Amino acid sequence: MSQGWRGGWSGGRGGNPYAGGWRGRPWRGRGQGGSWSRNSGRDPVCFSTAPPKPQLTQTTLDKYIPYKGWKLYFSEAYSDSSPFLEKVRAFEKFFTKQIELYDKDEIERKGSILVDYKDLLQDEDLSASIPMSSELKEMPEKILECMGLAIHQVLTKDLERHAAELQEQEGLRTEEAPIVNVPFIHARVFNYDPLTPLKNLRASLYGKYVALRGTVVRVSNIKPLCVKMAFSCNMCGDIQSFPFPDGKYAVPTKCPVPECRGRSFTANRSSPLTVTVDWQTIKVQELMSDDQREAGRIPRTVECELIQDLVDSCVPGDMVTVTGIVKVSNTRDGGFKNKNNKCMFLLYIEANSVSNSKGHKIKSTDDSESHGASMDFSLKDLYAIQEIQAQENLFQLIVNSLCPTIYGHELVKAGLSLALFGGCQKYADDKNRIPIRGDPHILVVGDPGLGKSQMLQAVCNVAPRGVYVCGNTTTTSGLTVTLSRDSATGDFGLEAGALILGDQGICGIDEFDKMGNQHQALLEAMEQQSISLAKAGIVCSLPARTSIIAAANPVGGHYNKGKTVSENLKMGSALLSRFDLVFILLDTPNEDHDHLLSEHVMAMRAGAKEMQSADLTCPTTQNSNTSVLEEPSERPLGERLKLRPGEHFDPIPHQLLRKYVGYARQYVHPTLSPDAAQVLQDFYLELRKQNQGIDSTPITTRQLESLIRLTEARARLELREKATKDDAEEVVQIMKYSLLGTFSDEFGKLDFHRSQHGSGMSNRSKAKKFISALNRIAEQTYNNLFEFQQLRQIAKELQIQLLGKFNHSDKMATEIPNLRAAPGNQLRPKGSVSVLITTWDCA
């Protein structure tokens, strides 16, 4: 070992509450003119006061106790017949074999050692001496104390041996054993199984060792907790250190000096014998899996207490596994009277270890960045994932397995499937760069009754971590973060909202158009992937790396293609521009489609397990155009995703699909190939070229980043590390389908002057609609002059109500934009059509 190892163990660890001069270092006391005394029955770290009591001195005890840290862990005196001695020796043998695997400096600095429960079970010598599974569960405090004493003894022997070697090298005397100072070591057992559901956390588990997994929804402030306090006797002045079990204040009942009969004591909070530790509480909410879902019940929560090195191990929204001892606390701090509630207690967990899925406390063996909620995969799961990956047309299988109850909408399901897998976040750990989000956001807008909510619920169900909320019953605090006051302490604590609970997962928001003013709370979360809070003196930022999947109904009940998406939803452009894909679902009557849809609904109602597929001819209202959005291809993606007529389709169960998605998000991190990057760049440049008008939709780098994210998700869907040219071309087709729905007008033509994300069309949509109709008729009839009767008839057909009397072209040009006055009392639109107004007299 190096010289620095010795220095790290030299006495006087000021930061550790259990470190001190228990190796016989005297203190100058206040009373009796001597050293400080100790209570041999209660106090593990105290000192001798007077020569008449040599049997109570630390040095005398240590000479005859082979375990020098015995009094740090056990209140009873050492005895060779102690029932715990055999267990300590077994653990000492175990740690002696494992000590080279641990960082000794880290153990001293933190005051704790992490022990894998699986290693304890696999050790044959330990299993022969101690039935670990039963004894750790039934008597956890004693087993943990034995483990702590064992590692304390191993480290002490190691340090003494090293110190003796250094003394020999320096030529010093070696008659006396070197004095070393090892602090109190907590043994923290992790990977404990089985996990206990919160619904089984009952009074029968009091005092037992349990492990539970959940989401952190509330974190309190860190406070000092006094575990030992020095009390001075008012009669003789003797000082003793009195322990506070579970942090409950108590006063000594008698003085440890035999000659003194004092019964009154004064607390000495500034004494070195007063020990305080960091203390924090968290509230953990259960994870709702498919087999545990219970209707009409709020999720269960449990309070957990963290001390010392466990504090600050998690933030609201983290998924944690807490192992600890079940304790009870009295409800006297509540709002009820003590006399009526003296027997009311609440269960809480005294945490022994906290495993954070983000790797804050216990790091995984994989050094790669953890994406998504960490999941455990059995060998059976891995074989099933391998079987799914080997399917011939995997994209079609996953798209049709997402929501089999909804017929059609293959490209919409394809976009939702890509959002499930998500892209790769860039520069997440680089402090010198701003992170680039990898989670795509998708908005589905359409007429009622087309299955938007069912597809949204299916996505949240398949996601390894999904949160589903409804917009009309959601508040801003419920979406982001809430400051709540603790009734017991009066301090403010953070409670996580839906976006933080969906961190590294999916947050589905239904009825997106009915949220009101809550839209502004989503702006930061959708782009910066975080939630900032500045309230009640607390300024913090919490992670919200979630994909937002929103479903909305247009204003008025039906989608009006004469308006833009912003006008149909009455939503700002800043929010809409953050969505990677915007799908428009229209309920257009079509005989073939309606027939196949009705057959599908009847088959679902009949309970058919395997449904026969039918060829769905999706109606389209778009006409041919020379735009880049409608380049012909050999076989469009929508046709390839459809099932062939008469084909028997067996969808992947959602429970297995959730495992597949979790595996892909956790272990697959694809990158773009040069060919794929070239395809995306060409498509983006073509979009920029076609959208250079004054009133056109701004095509920015957000669209290019969306293409990159979706292409990475397409490669991750097939567990590939490299995104190919075919992946990019399929994503381009999905993007074209999204843009076609948002750019096409009520006549089926592509109008790139429509502002998809803006609201500039709202005050002149009728005028633009009127001028567009005049341009279309002029092109068909090759006549650019219109009489009053024709204009009146066109306005009537378009259901446009013209207010006021227009007797002059200048006035009409002022009232209706895109018209400019021309000589001869005629009006000329922006296009090549001249409109001659002879008489205009309408109310």
UniProtKB/Swiss-Prot annotation:
GO molecular function, one term: DNA binding
Its EC number(s): 3.6.4.12
Compositionally biased residues, Gly residues: 1-23
Membrane-spanning ranges: none
Annotated GO CC locations: MCM8-MCM9 complex; nucleus
PROSITE patterns associated with the record: MCM_2 (PS50051)
Biological-process GO terms, alphabetical: DNA damage response; DNA replication; double-strand break repair via homologous recombination; regulation of DNA-templated DNA replication initiation
Superkingdom: Eukaryota
Gene3D superfamilies in the record: 2.20.28.10, Nucleic acid-binding proteins (2.40.50.140), P-loop containing nucleotide triphosphate hydrolases (3.40.50.300)
Intracellular or extracellular location(s): Nucleus
Keywords for the protein's UniProt record, in alphabetical order: ATP-binding, Cell cycle, DNA damage, DNA repair, DNA replication, DNA-binding, Helicase, Hydrolase, Nucleotide-binding, Nucleus
Domain MCM: start-end pairs: 394-601
Reaction(s) catalysed by this chain's protein: ATP + H2O = ADP + phosphate + H(+)
InterPro entries: AAA+_ATPase (IPR003593), MCM (IPR031327), MCM8/REC_WHD (IPR056875), MCM_dom (IPR001208), MCM_lid (IPR041562), MCM_OB (IPR033762), NA-bd_OB-fold (IPR012340), P-loop_NTPase (IPR027417)
Alphabetized Pfam families for the sequence: MCM (PF00493), MCM_lid (PF17855), MCM_OB (PF17207), WHD_MCM8 (PF25051)
UniProt-annotated binding residues for ATP: 446-453
Annotated region (Disordered), positions in chain: 1-52
Function statement: Component of the MCM8-MCM9 complex, a complex involved in homologous recombination repair following DNA interstrand cross-links and plays a key role during gametogenesis. The MCM8-MCM9 complex probably acts as a hexameric helicase required to process aberrant forks into homologous recombination substrates and to orchestrate homologous recombination with resection, fork stabilization and fork restart. In eggs, required for elongation during DNA replication by facilitating the recruitment of rpa2/rpa34 and stimulating the processivity of DNA polymerases at replication foci.
Family: Belongs to the MCM family.
Assembly, per entry: Component of the MCM8-MCM9 complex, which forms a hexamer composed of mcm8 and mcm9.
Name of the protein described by the UniProt record: DNA helicase MCM8
